Amino acid sequence: MKWRRILLNFRVIVLIFFLLISITALATRGLTFGLDISGGISITVKLEKPVDSQTMEQVKIALEQRLNTLGVKNIVVEPWGDQFVIVKVANVTEEEADQLIKTIERQGVFYAEFQGIIFATGKDILNVGSVSYDPQHSAWVVPFRLSKEAAEKFAQLALGKAGYPVDMFLDPPVNSTLVVSNRVYEAMLSKTFMLEGDMTLVERIEKAFGIKVVPYANVTPEEIAEIAKGSERIILLDVDGNLSKALKEMGFEVETRSMRSDEDVYDFIKRSLGLYGPYRVSEGLATGNPSTEVMISITAPKTDIQARQDAQVVSVVLRSGSLPVKLSIERIDYISPKLGENFKRQVLVAGIAALLVVGLIVFLHYRKIKIAIPVMFTSFSEVLIILGIAALIRWNLDLPSIAGIIAAIGTGVDQQIVITDELLGEEESRRRVKRSGVLRRMGRAFFIILASATTTIVAMSFLFKFFVGGLRGFAFTTILGVLVGIFITRPAYGEIAKVLIGERR
């Protein structure tokens, strides 16, 4: 009879309802785990200079848009101070991690240049098509549409200049001095970059971007420093690193770039300049008729995964536009998923053991199995409902989040003991508690619980609002656990306890 009264109680029905929803959510959607459990990558990104909160928010939003376009799930972008952003991605493959890094490093400043004149920028890109493979030209292509104004400007510039080179750049080293080896310098002057035009690549980039190119032959660091006056930085391409030290001592910002083992000198130049092309002006484009449909192509076999990834990165960057500041990768941390698998097993075992120990302690304290079992049941229900809600909203469970669940459950057990003690009251001496006394004591117990919960929620809300990283996960699950306890499990336990304890004669 008592169990019938318990099961038909409204608050117990609410508890059962949420339990069913949680079980369904866990079965259909499953839990998503954070970086420290599932493994993945954590990238510390440095902005080129400190920024205000508004600019930092722009960087955060732009990065989120870019990275989400890649199709990678569960990306977390967290500003850290005024010059750093931390990007965390769980359950990521090596290929996806490489794409993420390349996409982050791109500021995304686009220029289209002809004969040293910039005729289009990122603002002129109206639409970006899907990446595809062009078997006719053996290249991965990224088609996009330029504004009418940019197309008309190019048509005027290219009139009668069929065969001339058109260059497209993403993040060129504007206002820099390039100190290059002899082989790099000769390649930059070659017909490969000049095509049938009358300006070398060296001349075009200096006119368009103020990039000075200095061949490193019979030239001293002092002479290079004199040439580089007014440049934002000096970039050494395929040049001995000893020069870098001498220039840094003179106060210059110096970067050193070397050729990869799998690239030739021409690909190295393109990578260093952010150059796509040069593309040859066709006979049709040299007639003066504007065309808004253009494309960036990356010549490679269809089986070249690296080229396809590069094309996808270009597509993402063109779609999302340029970032307000340049970013650089400060640190990359890879976390193995094997550690997380072991941890999940340990947490499961520890959770079951903790539940049994709590039940045993409650039983030893009250000497009543009918008190220990409801306490264990409501604690287990609370965990299940919290996990069910986390599954529904796709919240990443990391170590601090799990710590928050444990904290909430610990608080929950304390509150159930408060309810139990209030209901028992003087029962041991009187062996009878009137209904009015039960209600009064229940009210007193819930007043204590609400006061404690309010304090916890206020404190955790501060952490959730003003802190980043693991503290937010801890605060979120703690608040969620407290709310589940106040509105679902604690009222249900109170009703169960009233029947089993408060009205026992």
From Swiss-Prot:
Gene Ontology terms: cellular component: plasma membrane
GO biological process: intracellular protein transmembrane transport; protein targeting
Keyword Transmembrane helix: yes
Keywords from the named record: Cell membrane, Membrane, Protein transport, Translocation, Transmembrane, Transmembrane helix, Transport
Compartmental location: Cell membrane
Membrane topology designation: Multi-pass membrane protein
Main subcellular localisation: membrane
Listed InterPro entries: SecD/SecF_arch_bac, SecD/SecF_CS, SecD_arc, SecD_SecF_C
Residues spanning the membrane: 6-26, 346-366, 373-393, 399-419, 446-466, 468-488
Function according to Swiss-Prot or TrEMBL: Involved in protein export.
PANTHER family: PROTEIN TRANSLOCASE SUBUNIT SECD, PROTEIN-EXPORT MEMBRANE PROTEIN SEC
Family: Belongs to the SecD/SecF family. SecD subfamily.
Quaternary structure and partners: Part of the protein translocation apparatus. Forms a complex with SecF.
HAMAP family registered for this protein in UniProt: SecD_A (MF_01463_A)
Protein name: Protein-export membrane protein SecD
